[in-house]
Amino acid sequence: MADELSEKSVEGTEEDGESAPAEGTTEGVPVDEVAKLRQELEDVKRIADERLEQLLRCRAELDNVIKRNSREREELARFASEAIIKKLLVFLDSLEQAAKHDEGAKALYDQLLDIMRSEGLEPIDAVGKKFDPFVHEAMMQVESQEAEDGIVVQEFQKGYTLHSRVIRTSKVAVAKHG
């Protein structure tokens, strides 16, 4: 049987015109060379994986920058009118005082307030509410038997929010039991 194998292998090499690979080789390439090529392939795959991971992290970071930039632009657009609205609050306060005595001034006050509301301005409700230091500024405490401690009993100046952000606190008097 061993003779048949050696004859076939000799015949195969004679028919192909090629010699059989030498011992310690793979298809005519030395084993050392194959091991070296495999190592290089593994190194290249590892580097490719590292680069892919790096690329994915960069892409995620870019997406985050784009989202943050978009949010900042939206917020800037929302609050671009804040400076002018703050300046108009003084006029709105004066018009509100005049509206208490004059119907024409009341109509103007209502129109201006509607315009400013359409831009996101909202008055802060104060009287009768629990004192909140985020929206109220206590100007004084008033002894009161009717109101509970910490309840706003008087408003000296109206406060406002712009798109739910306080742009001016309400100036108030807060009840305390005496």
UniProtKB/Swiss-Prot annotation:
Gene Ontology CC terms, in alphabetical order: cytoplasm
GO MF, one annotated term: adenyl-nucleotide exchange factor activity
Record's subcellular location: Cytoplasm
Region (Disordered): 1-32
Domain of life: Archaea
UniProt xrefs under Gene3D superfamilies: 3.90.20.20, Head domain of nucleotide exchange factor GrpE
Chief subcellular location: cytoplasm
UniProt keyword Cell membrane present: no
UniProt keyword Chaperone present: yes
One Pfam family recorded for the sequence: GrpE
Compositional bias per record (Basic and acidic residues), positions renumbered to this chain: 1-11
SUPFAM superfamilies documented for this protein: Coiled-coil domain of nucleotide exchange factor GrpE (SSF58014), Head domain of nucleotide exchange factor GrpE (SSF51064)
BP terms from Gene Ontology: protein folding
Keywords, ordered alphabetically: Chaperone, Cytoplasm, Stress response
Quaternary structure, from the entry: Homodimer.
The family this protein is said to belong to: Belongs to the GrpE family.
Function statement: Participates actively in the response to hyperosmotic and heat shock by preventing the aggregation of stress-denatured proteins, in association with DnaK and GrpE. It is the nucleotide exchange factor for DnaK and may function as a thermosensor. Unfolded proteins bind initially to DnaJ; upon interaction with the DnaJ-bound protein, DnaK hydrolyzes its bound ATP, resulting in the formation of a stable complex. GrpE releases ADP from DnaK; ATP binding to DnaK triggers the release of the substrate protein, thus completing the reaction cycle.
Name of protein: Protein GrpE
Biological source species: Methanothrix thermoacetophila (strain DSM 6194 / JCM 14653 / NBRC 101360 / PT) (Methanosaeta thermophila)
